[in-house]
Amino acid sequence: MKRALVSVSDKNNLVPFVKKLVEHDFEIVSTGGTKKYLDEAGIKTISVEEVTHFPEILDGRVKTLNPYIHGGLLARRELPEHMETLKEQNITPIDLVCVNLYPFKQTIENPEVTLENAIENIDIGGPSMLRSAAKNYRDVVVVVDADDYEGLEKELDENGEISLETRFKLSAKTFRHTAAYDALIADYLSKQAGEDNPEKLTLTYDLISSMRYGENSHQKAWFYEDAMPKAYSITQAKQLNGKKLSFNNIRDADAAIRAVREFDGPTVVALKHMNPCGIGQADNIELAWDRAYEADSISIFGGVIALNRKVDLATAEKMHKLFLEIIIAPEFDADALEVLSKKKNLRLLQLDFTKKDEDVRDETVSIMGGLLRQEQDVIDENPKNWEVVTENAPSDSQLETLLFAWKAVKHTKSNAIVVANDERTLGIGAGQPNRIDSTKIAIKHAGDSLNDKAVLASDAFFPMDDCVQYAAEHGIKAIVQPGGSIRDKDSIAMANKYGVAMVFTGVRHFRH
């Protein structure tokens, strides 16, 4: 007779699986609640204490850390000396292990969790058994996922045993499982210890789906989510309509979400290739849409739209007239959803953008052979902290417009220039190797919309005074930029020459 050790918290489909094991001549060893559950289901089980000849001690901290368990798991069946040792020590081999780990992740997801409670939910015996079983995969089947039950049942029925290929795959899966578990623990404890830059960085992500392709059709791609995702992450969006999100869709949607969360009032962000092409703000979301569309009615075609208010029918009917890839909003009125869903391919995503008191986590960027890690670019964008550096100071209304433009330029690829008025962006110059070209592009896009309310924002300092001169000659009345150039005085002098008000934020917003 073969022996299986079963100790799980996830009881889904457990009884049929264990009954199948019994049907194939397994005796069942179990612990605590799992044993009681199986006994009540009419399945005969053996307690772990009967196997170890030792009681559970230290409030359950020591149950399975015992040679009768690990000897039965680690003994290599093809080695006579191993099997002789088992016989001498009266240890029965264990042929299958099915174990869930303590719910550490669920524990630390509770904002009220204490360090003591978190530590008590660090599993020791479970990972030890899983690792022992996975190491000895040639002789032991190891199961960590209820989704694998059905396939194992089928294989037992068809072949009477689990193949070496399956055992090896389950072993690899188990080591991924325990590594991810330990990574969460390491990350949590490192944060509790105030370790911002640990010498070993452990990250864990869960596969959401395989993708049709990546950035281009010849590239394979997969979509993973952080094991502890943010509530407002694209990974948490609920898809209400449309085709499956593509690799590029997800990156664009992420950029749109980051941008729209900057704004408190009703705002619409239109985005293409991770750059905003139009941002509109108003007292209501319909008018904000009108302004975002007006900002660049050409580039918005095939774009991603993020709205930070519920989508009503009037707004939906206007958006329905265009070809759009994605619309993201916190809510959709029923009639608005009905209208937009008429386009079967239009991806509609529902996601709460509310600014919650979540921890601001670091973000990573992949490079060849490594990664870069940095704090997120989040800062209180408060004009009260800005410095007026010119003879003319911006008016209160200009300051509000400068703040709007400053938030917009923050989410535009460097070198970035945004021209805006108090209602919308007028022109966006993104991703140019030099700042004067970005300035010219932004002002060209603004065109006839330039008026005495137009302001300009630059994500980094002006290396020379040419951008200020060009902006002033085209009617810009106020400028916001970080400052910090060795030639700041030249830019200030040029602004004074044309009577342009200019403020320094002291903060740069490069975006690569």
UniProtKB/Swiss-Prot annotation:
Its EC number(s): 2.1.2.3, 3.5.4.10
UniProt cross-references to PROSITE patterns, sorted A to Z: MGS
Gene3D superfamilies linked: 3.40.140.20, Methylglyoxal synthase-like domain
Superkingdom, natural source: Bacteria
GO cellular component: cytosol
GO molecular function, a single term: phosphoribosylaminoimidazolecarboxamide formyltransferase activity
Catalytic activity: (6R)-10-formyltetrahydrofolate + 5-amino-1-(5-phospho-beta-D-ribosyl)imidazole-4-carboxamide = 5-formamido-1-(5-phospho-D-ribosyl)imidazole-4-carboxamide + (6S)-5,6,7,8-tetrahydrofolate; IMP + H2O = 5-formamido-1-(5-phospho-D-ribosyl)imidazole-4-carboxamide
Keywords: Hydrolase, Multifunctional enzyme, Purine biosynthesis, Transferase
The protein's annotated pathway: Purine metabolism; IMP biosynthesis via de novo pathway; 5-formamido-1-(5-phospho-D-ribosyl)imidazole-4-carboxamide from 5-amino-1-(5-phospho-D-ribosyl)imidazole-4-carboxamide (10-formyl THF route): step 1/1; Purine metabolism; IMP biosynthesis via de novo pathway; IMP from 5-formamido-1-(5-phospho-D-ribosyl)imidazole-4-carboxamide: step 1/1
Residue stretches making up the MGS-like domain: 1-144
GO biological process: 'de novo' IMP biosynthetic process
Domain notes: The IMP cyclohydrolase activity resides in the N-terminal region.
Family recorded in the similarity comment: Belongs to the PurH family.
Name of the protein this chain belongs to: Bifunctional purine biosynthesis protein PurH
Organism: Ligilactobacillus salivarius (strain UCC118) (Lactobacillus salivarius)
